[in-house]
Amino acid sequence: MAVRGANTLTSFSIQAILNKKEERGGLAAPEGRPAPGGTAASVAAAPAVCCWRLFGERDAGALGGAEDSLLASPAGTRTAAGRTAESPEGWDSDSALSEENESRRRCADARGASGAGLAGGSLSLGQPVCELAASKDLEEEAAGRSDSEMSASVSGDRSPRTEDDGVGPRGAHVSALCSGAGGGGGSGPAGVAEEEEEPAAPKPRKKRSRAAFSHAQVFELERRFNHQRYLSGPERADLAASLKLTETQVKIWFQNRRYKTKRRQMAADLLASAPAAKKVAVKVLVRDDQRQYLPGEVLRPPSLLPLQPSYYYPYYCLPGWALSTCAAAAGTQ
């Protein structure tokens, strides 16, 4: 299997990996597969052999003719000196088994694939039928490979697919991102307008300083207010100019003065409409010009007689016997 470049054919790295696996197992190279170190000419004749391996439609004579053509080519004569078809030990071990040659081969595959993609699109469009069949055969054999061999085989197929990223799902994703970016750019002014529509945080209002009027200004304003409660525009302008004030100051003073007058009037109306307090006649017991006690009574010493219950008990708290005693004493008097 080969990748067609701009001018030359470059062998595929999967072939070298398979040959290396067979060499480690001590197996002979199959008749339809070129030995390691095969050149572009040897790979060019591989379609017929691989088609025979897949479909079994070619005979030994055709296979022998293919081998004769391989040996007859200049590259075949150069590589056939150190190997035979039956002995793996005679193969060239420096062809594609080292990591350096493997990396060079991958770079060559990438360059060839990019050239093929630029010239005619994808690599899969220009592959022959036998190469497609061989690739299917390799996919069937890849089931028993190790992880390292699978990664090496996949690395050779990545470069041609990069040209078709714009067509596949990844390309659709990129186009969607681009369209989304374009839509976002188109909706940018709308987003800015929405942000502008949002109400800003209310700024704290600066406390306005009160205007200090002089006594002369207050006197003139009071005199004009008693004469005229409301001022027109020209009258307010003349009064402000005469008092060296602004029209706004004069207007605010008249508004406050009217409100103050209205509150006073409302308070007076409430007092007038309130019912009068009820008057009650109270007997005057003590007068300022009269004495309550005589001078002799105040200086009299207390009597030594035992106190009656009526003296140290309130009338409503006296017991029954005390009440009867008091009643009897009152009756005797």
UniProtKB/Swiss-Prot annotation:
One of its GO terms (molecular function) is DNA-binding transcription factor activity, RNA polymerase II-specific. Disulfide bonds: none annotated. This is Homeobox protein Nkx-3.2. It is found in: Nucleus. The lineage of its organism: Eukaryota, Metazoa, Chordata, Craniata, Vertebrata. Residues 75-85 have a biased composition (Low complexity). Residues 138-148 have a biased composition (Basic and acidic residues). Transcriptional repressor that acts as a negative regulator of chondrocyte maturation. PLays a role in distal stomach development; required for proper antral-pyloric morphogenesis and development of antral-type epithelium. In concert with GSC, defines the structural components of the middle ear; required for tympanic ring and gonium development and in the regulation of the width of the malleus. The gene is NKX3-2.
